[in-house]
């Protein structure tokens, strides 16, 4: 009987232990289920986060590609702008060189104009000198004509005296020797007068030749003055053309400077846009 009681007590104890063990196992099972559910929830949450991150990554990659494409376009625009700026600088340099050459040509034309003006002044002075000399020659010619008239008058007087001597020789034969002497004296005087007349004639011819030469020189000087006047007009025309060319080049330089300012503003706008793009990329 005691053995049965002991056995029943032992079985009851085993039962209690089994119940406790079962309760413990159930609790552990519930805890395991809770942990499993929590793990599944965390896994789903992580999956959502991973999906969101992948979506964000795709958007970021797409934005990065757009930004890179935009950056490439900006680089190309910047290169084009730099090329245009270089071309404009080259054009400005060429225009400045043309302007310098035009200024040199203008200076040369101005110097030639001054030389031509000086030559005209010298020609005018020479013309005035020739006019004065021509007046002096005319006065000398008048004086020589007067001398010639006097010589002719003296010759006529000599002829009269010769006739008188001849008549006296015919009328007074006794006074032949004295009359001959007087006749010889008259002849000598006639010879002298003829020589003087010949000299006057030669002088007159020389004066005529000098007058012809003076007229020729005057014509030459007139031709030189005409040529110099033509050259002066041509120089003035070249100077006016050079001045118009300089004004035209100045307008072209002003226009190129305006284009350069516009390109600089365009270049600044591109740089600002690039800075903004880099700032946006840095924010990502």
UniProtKB/Swiss-Prot annotation:
- Which InterPro entries is this protein grouped with? Tropomyosin
Q: Which GO terms describe its biological process?
A: regulation of muscle contraction
What Pfam family is a match for this entry?
Tropomyosin
Q: Which Gene3D superfamilies match?
A: 1.20.5.170, 1.20.5.340
Q: What would be an example GO MF term here?
A: protein homodimerization activity
PROSITE patterns tied to this protein: TROPOMYOSIN
- The coiled-coil segments of this chain are 22-266
Per UniProt, the keywords (alphabetical) are:
Allergen, Coiled coil, Muscle protein, Repeat
Query: Assembly and interactions?
Result: Homodimer.
According to the UniProt entry, the note on domains is:
The molecule is in a coiled coil structure that is formed by 2 polypeptide chains. The sequence exhibits a prominent seven-residues periodicity.
Q: What exactly does this protein do? A: Tropomyosin, in association with the troponin complex, plays a central role in the calcium dependent regulation of muscle contraction.
- What does the similarity note say? Belongs to the tropomyosin family.
What protein is this chain from? Answer: Tropomyosin Per a 7.0101
Q: What is the scientific name of the source organism?
A: Periplaneta americana (American cockroach)
